[in-house]
Amino acid sequence: MAVLKPLCPLLLLSIICFGLIRSEANGPKVTDKVFFDIEVDGKPLARIIIGLFGKTVPKTVENFKQLSIGTQLKDGRTASYKGSTFHRVIKSFMIQGGDFTNHDGTGGFSIYGDRFPDENFKLRHVGAGWLSMANAGPDTNGSQFFITTVKTSWLDGKHVVFGKVVEGMNIVRQIESETTDSRDRPVKSIKIASCGHIPVEIPFSVTNSDAVE
């Protein structure tokens, strides 16, 4: 009868570490990335890169991706996040943007028309750095979005999660810390000066946790 030899310590450690990595990166898969180059009162700040979960919420991701690229709709309207602002900022909650028409939270529209239905609620607001659709109630998605700065589980089942910050969470934190007025509007103009799409050749999973700084 053959006797199994014990695994060498280095090999055993490698197996354990690989298992830990796999268990940590067990969240949704990033299929596309977009970038936002941020300006504060006209001064360049830095770039935020967001991973999008195109296999889980393809329609919502396509809307966000096209608005990041900039597109002209069949009705002749131009839709783009470029030049829009983060119009609502609440510390220890979220930063909100995407209103490229009125810049105050009352406007914006989707590539599918003014509004489109909630795609699904498969993903949750599990920590800081998660991207979700802002809305005015069920099935009222347009172009507005928010990025969480804490876990916001009370929003699960009400807002569609479709991405996560993969680079530049420290910039999100800086925006979160900006001074606001009584209506949660930043005193300074926080603008998306430039934005666009970054292709992802090989989809990768993210962790179900806070985005790294």
UniProtKB/Swiss-Prot annotation:
Specify the PPIase cyclophilin-type domain's residue ranges.
35-197
Any inhibitors or activators noted?
Answer: Inhibited by cyclosporin A (CsA).
**InterPro entries per the record?**
Cyclophilin-like_dom_sf, Cyclophilin-type_PPIase_CS, Cyclophilin-type_PPIase_dom
Single Gene Ontology MF annotation: cyclosporin A binding
Q: Please name the Gene3D superfamilies in this protein's record.
A: Cyclophilin-like
Residues of the signal peptide: 1-23
Instruction: State the source organism's domain of life.
Output: Eukaryota
Catalytic reaction list: [protein]-peptidylproline (omega=180) = [protein]-peptidylproline (omega=0)
Q: Which residues form a coiled coil?
A: none
Which family, according to the similarity comment? Belongs to the cyclophilin-type PPIase family. PPIase B subfamily.
Q: What is this protein called?
A: Peptidyl-prolyl cis-trans isomerase B
